[in-house]
């Protein structure tokens, strides 16, 4: 999965001369929290709702309401925007984007292709992608298998047993657990009755520690 597959394409933008009040209005009217700042087709910054809040004078200020309104009415985006934001290319792998976001504590990325802003990827886009990838909105069953040795043969057996029951795998997550020196797999299967599959997993020697049917309305078991 690439960033181009999950980003919001052709996002709204403002230029650096845009008044802060106008940028705030755009965010409110379009229910968005971030705006790339583009001058003459080139990305020069990013402005967020948090930036707007920080730009607002403190309630403890000695300025009058008239003076406050005057200052805000003259303030421009270029005065409070974050300059030179970290960008990603459309073909950046999702995992790489997630790693960069965690390391740099970034909640969103402008997506730039050949110098042009073509999209934006935010926390909401990431959550939507993970929801789809994990099959959370689809009804089915969840099965957890622990104590695996990380062998390819284990994975082959799990898939083979699932196929024998003509059941679709909605998602499969494999996690290493260094503290226990083993691996754990969490399966989401397109079946309302996981018991026969669990029985065959156990016959094959797998340690099934959890199984249940879940509803898509809650996204959980």
Question: Regions from the language model: what does each represent?
Answer:
Residues 170-172, 199-219:
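Conserved short beta-strand edge segments in small beta-sheet-based binding/regulatory domains
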Residues 43, 176-183, 212-221:
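Short proline/glycine- and acidic-rich turn/helix-capping motifs at secondary-structure junctions
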Residues 18-25, 98:
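Short, basic/aromatic recognition patches
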Residues 183-191:
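Short basic, glycine-rich beta-strand/loop surfaces that mediate nucleic-acid
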């Amino acid at each position: 999965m690439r960033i181009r597959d999950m980003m919001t394409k052709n996002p709204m933008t403002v230029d650096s001369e845009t008044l802060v009040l106008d940028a705030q209005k755009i965010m409110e009217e379009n229910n968005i929290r971030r705006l790339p700042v583009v001058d003459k087709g080139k990305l020069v910054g990013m402005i967020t709702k948090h930036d707007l809040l920080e730009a607002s004078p403190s309630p403890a200020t000695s300025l009058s309401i008239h003076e406050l309104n005057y200052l805000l009415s003259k303030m421009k985006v270029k005065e409070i925007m974050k300059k030179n934001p970290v960008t990603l290319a459309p073909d950046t792998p999702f995992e790489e984007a997630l790693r960069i976001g965690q390391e740099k504590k970034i909640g969103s990325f402008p997506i730039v292709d050949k110098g042009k802003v073509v999209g934006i990827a935010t926390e909401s886009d990431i959550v939507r992608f993970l929801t789809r990838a994990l099959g959370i909105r689809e009804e089915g069953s969840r099965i957890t298998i622990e104590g695996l040795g990380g062998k390819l043969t284990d994975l082959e057996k799990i898939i083979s047993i699932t196929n024998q029951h003509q059941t679709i795998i909605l998602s499969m997550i494999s996690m290493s657990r260094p503290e226990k020196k083993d691996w754990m797999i969490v399966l989401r299967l397109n079946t309302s009755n996981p018991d026969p599959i669990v029985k065959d997993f156990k016959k094959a020697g797998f340690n099934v520690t959890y199984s249940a049917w879940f509803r898509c309305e809650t996204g959980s078991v």
